[in-house]
Every structure is written in C-alpha cells, then in structure tokens.
C-alpha cells in the first residue's frame, strides 16, 4: 500500500465529524491494505508509531525538503525508514538522523509530508480514537464490533488484533485471551464534577478510593515470574525491582492486578509526580531504588490462581484482592451512600497530599480498554487567568481556524510573560470562530506565513488545569497538566493576569 493512500484517508477522517463516516472510510482503507501493512496502518491512524518513539519532534521538522511531485513511498518503506531513524545512536547520530529524515521527506508528496509531520509530532488530530478504530476493523473484517473490542481489550494491542481479524477472522481473534504475562488494556475513568455527582451517577452508593498521583501499573505473576506494564502497556519490570519483590511475597501462584506505584516521603506523603516518573524514564531504573524507592498500592484484581475476574462485579474482585494483599499495600477505600461521608473522605485524601478520589460502582465489571461508566474520577479544579502568547493553525475539522493557544503567566520582575503550556481543549465551535478573528487582529506579523502565529500579549483567558509538573521545555521550569479553556476574560487586561509567583505558590504547596 502506498503512503499517499493512508495520508488521504487520514485527511478524510479528520475532515469528517460523523462517526459512521470515519468508520466507513477507515474500513475501506483496511480492506485494501496488504496483510503485512494492516497493523502498521492501524497504528498510524491511531496516532502511534509501532516503534513508539524514534527521537523526532517539532525541532527536527522545522525545515524539510521540497515535496516530491509524485507519490512513490510505500507503507513498508516508510516503516523501515522509521525503524532506521529510531535505531540511529552514538556519535554523529543527530546528523545521521537529520539526513535520514530529510531523505524521507524529500520522497514524500505535500499531502504525505503533512501526514508524516503530524504523525511524528503526535499532532494527528483526526478523531480516530480506539473505539472508532475497533469498529472500523470490525467493519473491514465483517465481524461483530463486540468481538473485536473484546479481543483488543484482552490483547492490549489493537494493531495486532486488526491484523488477525483481517487475515483469519474469528479464528484469528480466538488467540486473544486473558493470560498472566500478557498486558491487557486498562479500564479508564470518566469524570464527575464532585462526590455528590458521582453518587448520583452510580446509583446512590459508591466505593470511593484515594486517587494517588503515582504511576499506574498492571502487575502480572506466573509462579516466580513477574511482569509489570505501564498504562500504555510498556514493560517496565526491570526498572521496578521493589514492586517485583512485593508481588512475589503475595500468597498466590498466578495474578493480574491493577496497582499504583508511587514514591513516598518518610512521613508517608507523596513526592511530586516527577519523582515517581523518573523511575519510568529511560534513565530510571534499579540504580534509583535506594534513593527513590517506590511503594505499591493495589486497587483491583483481574485474575487470580486460574480464576478470571473481568466479568465479576467490583465487590467480588475487591473481596478477592483483600484476601491476597496486605492492608498496607491497598489504597484507602470507603463504601458509602452518604454525600457527607464521601466529601469528608475526599477532603481527607486531599489533605494527605493525593490528587483526588475515584468513585466506583460496586457491581460493575472490569471494562478493560474502555472508559467505563462504572469508574468516575473526582479531582479539585484549579484555575488561572493567563495571557495568550501565540496560536497554532488547526487541522482537520479545525483547518482554517486558529486553535492551539500558547499560555503565559505575567512576570512582574521583567514585565514579560512566562510560558506554561498550550491547549486546544474546551473550545467550542463558536469559540474557535471568535478566537480566529480575535487573534488575527492581534497577530504580530503575517498570520498566514507560519504554522504558529505570534500575537500581542493582550488577551486574557481563564484556564482550568489538574496540577503543575516540572518541565525543562518552558523557562519557568513548570508546565500545566491537562489544561483546558474555561472562558475568555475580556473584562481583564493582561496586567490583571495571574503572575508566575502565584503559579509557583501553587506548585510549591503540591498543587
């Protein structure tokens, strides 16, 4: 299959707001893909490289060669080149990687260059989410969507499921079963406004758990063998020996469990998320165990000693979890129908330094790989009034509109602004239309000449965010987590915006 076919389908999917149209377009593409290309195409259209990371970002793509006149690149050839770029290391690797990248882009047409750029920078915003992609695979293979979704849930690898479905149909999907040692797509949570909202949505009674600001891990044990996977299903077993040790101490033979790994201070309060995250990076590992040990807290059980629990109600899974794990290695928990008791638990959890609570149905099954209605997260909302420093032209449905806004806090010391991140979340169609007009008026230079449009720092926007994290990308050393637009504040001048000192105060008190 030619790359131009994938790029064209991606553009069509991005331009459509209709779910069924997206599914039909992707399914049509998958039917035409060769069996060796299916998994690659599904990965790319899901916004992922099969290699995950190959060391290419926006900085590497600021200047690319002129586009080719005719499409010649195949999916297999581009995949091979991605692998070669990712494998480039050692002395002179930066120059070699740049040359390989230039060679690739010089062979790509304009539409292919656009697709490659967005794929490599994680900006492939086309609405081909996992649910859409799974349904497209089902349509292409003429299989029930539920069958494909369950295989993807158990296999934790939709591209592999797609390849099996398109090649061998039902028989191909039979290989995807729950097995210790084989990562499963984790169940995800929806959001509730507060604990009362959570209780209402869960039928009046809920199990509330402390939501730790650590790293979610899926722990597998087969006899004396332990495997640990991240939320994105990366194998990090070798980096977490203390979690392996804790798992081997449990009185079980086989197990698949959901847990949180977190770095704690001597007083039991959590370190900042970055301290925990440092153990999961490329440079993290066993050498950090003594200075930065992780504690493990289990919160769900998917399988134990030959018994699959995915379809069991939550109260049964938790009862089995409690039977095989010590109190000290389980998250704090409260089952209640009393909003007052739930709020007290929420407040106590925040006071302990954690980021919020999870509210869970006591009767819901474990919906692996899905954002199930049986799990709701409740977190405090922070807001800041920040100033827009620049805006990026959108793509897909947002093509022709100024979309992603760069956010800065006021610096009283210099009179300037310190960038804290960027977001396009929370924007309605009406807001996009308004801000396009507004920022074109504020543009500092030719707004059509660059992907990023610098603007005069005059527009104040109210931003909600979940917290702050350490960042080397921005000069203030901090970045907003999960920022989204609440509203534009035309009643405020840039001099009324929150200062970088205010942001630091939030950061220092643990968000």
From Swiss-Prot:
<feature type="active site" description="N6-AMP-lysine intermediate">
    <location>
        <position position="211"/>
    </location>
</feature>
<keyword id="KW-0547">Nucleotide-binding</keyword>
<keyword id="KW-0132">Cell division</keyword>
<feature type="binding site">
    <location>
        <position position="231"/>
    </location>
    <ligand>
        <name>ATP</name>
    </ligand>
</feature>
<keyword id="KW-0234">DNA repair</keyword>
<dbReference type="InterPro" id="IPR036599">
    <property type="entry name" value="DNA_ligase_N_sf"/>
</dbReference>
<dbReference type="GO" id="GO:0005524">
    <property type="term" value="F:ATP binding"/>
</dbReference>
<dbReference type="InterPro" id="IPR050191">
    <property type="entry name" value="ATP-dep_DNA_ligase"/>
</dbReference>
<dbReference type="Pfam" id="PF01068">
    <property type="entry name" value="DNA_ligase_A_M"/>
</dbReference>
<feature type="binding site">
    <location>
        <position position="299"/>
    </location>
    <ligand>
        <name>ATP</name>
    </ligand>
</feature>
<dbReference type="InterPro" id="IPR012308">
    <property type="entry name" value="DNA_ligase_ATP-dep_N"/>
</dbReference>
<keyword id="KW-0067">ATP-binding</keyword>
<feature type="binding site">
    <location>
        <position position="260"/>
    </location>
    <ligand>
        <name>ATP</name>
    </ligand>
</feature>
<feature type="binding site">
    <location>
        <position position="209"/>
    </location>
    <ligand>
        <name>ATP</name>
    </ligand>
</feature>
<feature type="binding site">
    <location>
        <position position="377"/>
    </location>
    <ligand>
        <name>ATP</name>
    </ligand>
</feature>
<dbReference type="InterPro" id="IPR016059">
    <property type="entry name" value="DNA_ligase_ATP-dep_CS"/>
</dbReference>
<dbReference type="InterPro" id="IPR012309">
    <property type="entry name" value="DNA_ligase_ATP-dep_C"/>
</dbReference>
<feature type="binding site">
    <location>
        <position position="216"/>
    </location>
    <ligand>
        <name>ATP</name>
    </ligand>
</feature>
<keyword id="KW-0227">DNA damage</keyword>
<dbReference type="GO" id="GO:0003677">
    <property type="term" value="F:DNA binding"/>
</dbReference>
<keyword id="KW-0436">Ligase</keyword>
<keyword id="KW-0131">Cell cycle</keyword>
<feature type="binding site">
    <location>
        <position position="371"/>
    </location>
    <ligand>
        <name>ATP</name>
    </ligand>
</feature>
<dbReference type="InterPro" id="IPR012310">
    <property type="entry name" value="DNA_ligase_ATP-dep_cent"/>
</dbReference>
<dbReference type="GO" id="GO:0071897">
    <property type="term" value="P:DNA biosynthetic process"/>
</dbReference>
<dbReference type="GO" id="GO:0003910">
    <property type="term" value="F:DNA ligase (ATP) activity"/>
</dbReference>
<dbReference type="GO" id="GO:0051301">
    <property type="term" value="P:cell division"/>
</dbReference>
<comment type="function">
    <text>DNA ligase that seals nicks in double-stranded DNA during DNA replication, DNA recombination and DNA repair.</text>
</comment>
<comment type="similarity">
    <text>Belongs to the ATP-dependent DNA ligase family.</text>
</comment>
<keyword id="KW-0235">DNA replication</keyword>
<protein>
    <recommendedName>
        <fullName>Probable DNA ligase</fullName>
        <ecNumber>6.5.1.1</ecNumber>
    </recommendedName>
</protein>
<dbReference type="InterPro" id="IPR022865">
    <property type="entry name" value="DNA_ligae_ATP-dep_bac/arc"/>
</dbReference>
<dbReference type="Pfam" id="PF04675">
    <property type="entry name" value="DNA_ligase_A_N"/>
</dbReference>
<dbReference type="GO" id="GO:0006310">
    <property type="term" value="P:DNA recombination"/>
</dbReference>
<dbReference type="GO" id="GO:0046872">
    <property type="term" value="F:metal ion binding"/>
</dbReference>
<keyword id="KW-0233">DNA recombination</keyword>
<dbReference type="GO" id="GO:0006260">
    <property type="term" value="P:DNA replication"/>
</dbReference>
<keyword id="KW-0479">Metal-binding</keyword>
<dbReference type="GO" id="GO:0006281">
    <property type="term" value="P:DNA repair"/>
</dbReference>
<dbReference type="Pfam" id="PF04679">
    <property type="entry name" value="DNA_ligase_A_C"/>
</dbReference>
<dbReference type="InterPro" id="IPR000977">
    <property type="entry name" value="DNA_ligase_ATP-dep"/>
</dbReference>
<keyword id="KW-0460">Magnesium</keyword>
């Amino acid at each position: 299959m030619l790359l131009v076919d994938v790029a064209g389908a991606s553009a069509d999917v991005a331009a459509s707001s209709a779910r069924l149209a997206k599914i039909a377009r992707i399914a049509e593409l998958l039917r035409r893909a060769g069996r060796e290309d299916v998994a690659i195409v599904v990965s790319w259209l899901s916004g992922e490289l099969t290699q995950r990371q190959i060391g290419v970002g926006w900085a590497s793509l600021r200047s690319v060669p002129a586009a080719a006149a005719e499409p010649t690149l195949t999916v297999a050839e581009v995949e091979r080149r991605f692998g070669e770029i990712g494998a480039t290391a050692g002395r002179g690797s930066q120059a070699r990687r740049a040359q390989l990248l230039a060679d690739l882009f010089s062979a790509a047409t304009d539409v292919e260059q656009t697709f490659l750029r967005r794929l490599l920078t994680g900006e492939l915003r086309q609405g081909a989410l996992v649910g859409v992609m799974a349904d497209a695979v089902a349509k292409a293979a003429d299989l029930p969507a539920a069958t494909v979704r369950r295989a993807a849930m158990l296999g934790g690898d939709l591209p592999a499921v797609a390849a099996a479905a398109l090649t061998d149909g039902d028989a191909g999907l039979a290989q995807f079963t729950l097995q210790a040692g084989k990562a499963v797509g984790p169940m995800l949570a929806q959001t509730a406004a507060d604990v009362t909202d959570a209780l209402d949505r869960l039928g009046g009674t809920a199990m509330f758990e402390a939501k730790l600001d650590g790293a979610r891990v899926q722990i597998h044990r087969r006899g004396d063998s332990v495997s640990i996977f991240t939320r994105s299903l990366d194998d990090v077993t070798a980096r977490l020996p203390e979690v392996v040790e804790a798992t081997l101490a449990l009185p079980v033979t086989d197990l698949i469990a959901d847990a949180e790994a977190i770095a704690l201070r001597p007083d039991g309060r959590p370190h900042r998320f970055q301290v925990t995250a440092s153990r999961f990076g490329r440079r993290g590992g066993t050498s950090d165990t003594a200075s930065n040990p992780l504690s493990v807290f289990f919160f769900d059980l998917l399988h134990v000693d030959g018994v699959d629990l995915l379809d069991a109600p939550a109260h049964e899974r938790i009862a089995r979890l409690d039977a095989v794990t010590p109190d000290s290695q389980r998250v704090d928990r409260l089952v209640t129908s009393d909003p007052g008791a739930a709020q007290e638990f929420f407040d106590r959890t925040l006071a302990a330094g954690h980021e919020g609570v999870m509210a869970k149905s006591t009767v819901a099954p474990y919906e692996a790989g899905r954002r199930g209605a049986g799990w709701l997260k409740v977190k405090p909302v922070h807001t800041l009034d920040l100033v827009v420093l620049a805006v990026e032209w959108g793509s897909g449905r947002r093509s022709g509109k100024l979309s992603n806004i760069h956010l800065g806090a006021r610096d009283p010391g210099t009179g300037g602004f310190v960038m804290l991140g960027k977001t396009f979340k929370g924007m309605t169609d009406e807001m996009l239309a308004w801000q396009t007009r507004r920022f074109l008026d504020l543009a500092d230079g030719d707004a059509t000449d660059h992907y990023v449009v610098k603007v005069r720092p005059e527009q104040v926007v109210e931003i909600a965010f979940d917290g702050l994290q350490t960042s080397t990308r921005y000069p203030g050393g901090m970045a907003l987590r999960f920022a989204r637009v609440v509203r534009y504040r035309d009643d405020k001048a840039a001099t009324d915006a929150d200062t970088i000192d205010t942001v630091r105060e939030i950061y220092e008190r643990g968000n």
